[in-house]
Amino acid sequence: MDLRSFFPLSLRLLLVRIRWFWKHYRSIRYDSELFNNVHGPLTYNTDGLATSNNADFMREERFARAYKAAAATNPWPGFTLQWRIHVVCWCAEQASLLPGDFVECGVNTGAYARSIVEYLPFNSLGKKFYLLDTFQGLDPRFISDAERTRGIDNYKYRDSYAEVVQTFRDFDVRIIRGPVPDTLSQCDTGQICYLSIDMNNVLPEIAALEYFWEKVVDGGFILLDDYGFPQHELQKAAFDRFAEARGQSILCLPTGQGIIRKARTPLYHETNTGR
């Protein structure tokens, strides 16, 4: 029996942060500044991102509706992912102009997908949206020892399958329940314009990207939700290796997300030969 299950989520997350501080505190100087060179009052300060830059998108009516729909799925108490969902909706809108379907690996309550189908006239696009998840959290078979030491398995999820079925009952969405990579073959689309990967650990995420890569159309968008987060360095390293091997580039955003826009031909990378 895992004794951690007896402790509340808030305490488990606090312990993860304490472990991080204990590992890194020597690099924090006494006179360190938390905020440097902000250009006015903070316009956004949540989800690991603080900025004084323009955040007018949060007041746009279409985005506000999409975000409200996402938040209504209630992924967790205090859900505040406006900028991440702004990125999700932007990528989805650009991808909607391309041939192919939408695929999301790692769904939880469906917040990201729900924001997309609200933001776009999704049912009029002639596309399908495939949602793949266990709908009850990470499969412990696929969590490595290195990931466990980072606290990846401390996150707890409720069984959200019935909620997700209800949430998307009016949309052209196919819900595939089970662990990735076991369920990948059930996603029968031939082309993909938008692929979201958010399963919080390396094995299923790389398996999904390898499986779907050839189906992603040229110019298609691949959104990596955990790419830049400090607890998920192993995923970032794995995605970097994947992209480098295929001559692709990953845009790292201050939201923690990473974006690949699939290049038709491999991008040029300077080598030590000087060529």
Regions found by a protein language model. Give the residues of each.
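Membrane-proximal basic amphipathic "stem/tether" segments
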Residues: M1-A72, A263-T265
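S-adenosylmethionine/decaboxylated-SAM
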Residues: D47-Q82, C89, S96-R275
